[in-house]
C-alpha cells in the first residue's frame, strides 16, 4: 500500500520541484493501491510542488455532446431541450482522461475553465491565470490554458499514463505551420448569465487526428508519434511512482520539438524525400 510520503518522494525524485507548474496525466490503476485513494495522490502532487506550485489537469466534461454534434450531426429537439448546460462549478469530469481529475476539481481552491469539452482544472497560485479565459474555438491552441501552461514554463507529468496523453502536444499541432490540417465543428450547451441555455457552435483543429494519416484507427496519432520521437532524445526524466512507469517533460521543450517535427515532415515543403512525403503513413521518415 503506497503512502502519501512515498508518492511525494517518488514524484520529487523524478525532478518535480517546489514552485513548479505541473500538468498531470495519471492512471490510478497503474500507480496501484494507495492509502486514502485518489485524494492522497492529489495531496502528494500538491506537496511535491509546495504552496508556491500549481497542479493542472485536463477535466473535460462527462456530459459533453461532442460526438453527438460532430461535423453537422444534430441532437433531436427533446435532447437539446433537456441536455444540461455546462457549469464549471458542478460539471463532472470525463473519466477517459483519468479519475484523478475529478478529485482535482473537488480540491479546495480549484479553478476550472469555461470551455466545456476542453475544460482544464488547476489548483494553486496560477490557477486563475491558467483557466481564464477559455472560449469556444480556443480549445487547446492559441488563447487556451494549454498555451499559458507552456508559456509559463510548465512541466508535463505522466503518472502511468501512455505517451499519447501529452496534452501540451495538441498545442504544437495547433501552432505548427503545416497544410491540410483537419478541422471539426460541434455544438455545446452554454449557460448564460441569467440562467438561460444557448447552444453554440465551435470550430477547432481536430485533436483526434491533425492530419488524415494521424486519424487512422489503430495507428499512432501525432501526439504519440512526437512523444516517442522525443523520448529517444533523452531530454526527459523517467522513473517509477508506486507501480507506475512515469515521464516528466519540459513543456516548452517538447512543444518546440513537436512543432519542428511536424513542420519538417509535413510542412508545405517537407524536409524529407518526396516519395516519403507523398506516402499516407505518418511514420517518422528519419
Swiss-Prot record:
Reaction catalyzed: a 2-deoxystreptamine antibiotic + acetyl-CoA = an N(3)-acetyl-2-deoxystreptamine antibiotic + CoA + H(+)
SUPFAM superfamilies: TTHA0583/YokD-like
Alphabetized UniProt keyword annotations: Acyltransferase, Antibiotic resistance, Transferase
GO biological process, one term: response to antibiotic
Superkingdom in the source lineage: Bacteria
InterPro entries, alphabetized: Amioglycoside_AcTrfase, Antibiotic_NAT-like
Any Pfam family: Antibiotic_NAT
Cysteine disulfide links: none
Enzyme Commission number(s) from the entry: 2.3.1.81
Name of the top EC class for this enzyme: transferase
GO molecular function, one term: aminoglycoside 3-N-acetyltransferase activity
Physiological role: Resistance to antibiotics containing the 2-deoxy-streptamine ring including gentamicin, kanamycin, tobramycin, neomycin and apramycin.
PANTHER family: AMINOGLYCOSIDE N3-ACETYLTRANSFERASE, SPBETA PROPHAGE-DERIVED AMINOGLYCOSIDE N(3')-ACETYLTRANSFERASE-LIKE PROTEIN YOKD
Family recorded in the similarity comment: Belongs to the antibiotic N-acetyltransferase family.
NCBIfam families from the UniProt entry: AAC_3 (NF033082), AAC_3_II (NF033080)
UniProt-recorded name of the protein: Aminoglycoside N(3)-acetyltransferase III
